[in-house]
From Swiss-Prot:
Signal peptide, first to last residue: none
Family from the record: Belongs to the UPRTase family.
Pathway membership, UniProt: Pyrimidine metabolism; UMP biosynthesis via salvage pathway; UMP from uracil: step 1/1
Positions that bind uracil: 193, 198-200
Organism per entry: Salmonella typhimurium (strain LT2 / SGSC1412 / ATCC 700720)
Coiled-coil annotated spans: none
Protein's name in the database: Uracil phosphoribosyltransferase
Activity regulation behaviour: Allosterically activated by GTP.
E.C. number: 2.4.2.9
Presence of the UniProt keyword Magnesium in the record: yes
Entry's Gene Ontology BP terms: UMP salvage; uracil salvage
Domain of life: Bacteria
GTP-binding in keyword set: yes
Length: 208
């Protein structure tokens, strides 16, 4: 599995600010979107382009235009919505597929409760967005749903990832690509990432 830890100074700086315990909801939300945008820049670096001719200010001009598979952004509810706008800043024409998944706090297993995928998802590249890759359960279950629907080109974008989640994802879906702003130390006894970001969903939606 391709694993990319984005080490750009801007990414590291913004993620560091997100780790502050007393960060405001507004600031956390802004930074989640900004880091999501920077991760998208990395994840789409291999998109193919083609030459097309358009009418410029002084006559015809040849430009590069993205070709090939179109994109669907797949936020995992609810926290994934915090990264979605940042992704769409780079790929504004992308369609949105939504997957609702929550983690059973006792078993740590993912529980699906909603899904709405674009109709032609088999023709698109999916960018799954979720702030945390902890045990990997929610992301793995989401990929299962996408593959069942016919999607074969899948990339995962997360703010922070635990080694345990990376290992589980690689075992379940070695053909996907993972882009993260940080590979953190690991999980605590409650299944939360250390040092992590705390509860990203609560911080994005102001419910902490």
């Amino acid at each position: 599995m391709k694993i990319v830890e984005v080490k750009h100074p801007l990414v590291k700086h913004k993620l560091g600010l997100m780790r502050e315990n007393d960060i405001s909801t507004k600031r956390f939300r802004e930074l989640a979107s900004e880091v999501g945008s920077l991760l998208t820049y990395e994840a789409t670096a291999d998109l193919e382009t083609e030459k097309v001719t358009i009418e410029g200010w002084n006559g015809p001009v040849e430009i590069d235009q993205i070709k090939g598979k179109k994109i669907t952004v797949v936020p995992i509810l609810r926290a994934g919505l915090g990264m979605m706008e940042g992704v769409l800043e780079n790929v504004p024409s992308a369609r949105i597929s939504v997957v609702g998944m929550y983690r059973n706090e006792e078993t740590l297993e993912p529980v699906p409760y909603f899904q709405k995928l674009v109709s032609n998802i088999d023709e698109r590249m999916a960018l799954i967005v979720d702030p945390m890759l902890a045990t990997g359960g929610s992301v793995i279950a989401t990929i299962d749903l996408l593959k069942k629907a016919g999607c074969s080109s899948i990339k995962v974008l997360v703010l922070v990832a635990a080694p345990e989640g990376i290992a589980a994802l690689e075992k379940a879906h070695p053909d996907v690509e993972l882009y993260t702003a940080s590979i953190d130390q690991g999980l605590n006894e409650h299944g939360y990432i250390i040092p992590g970001l705390g509860d990203a969903g609560d911080k994005i939606f102001g419910t902490k």
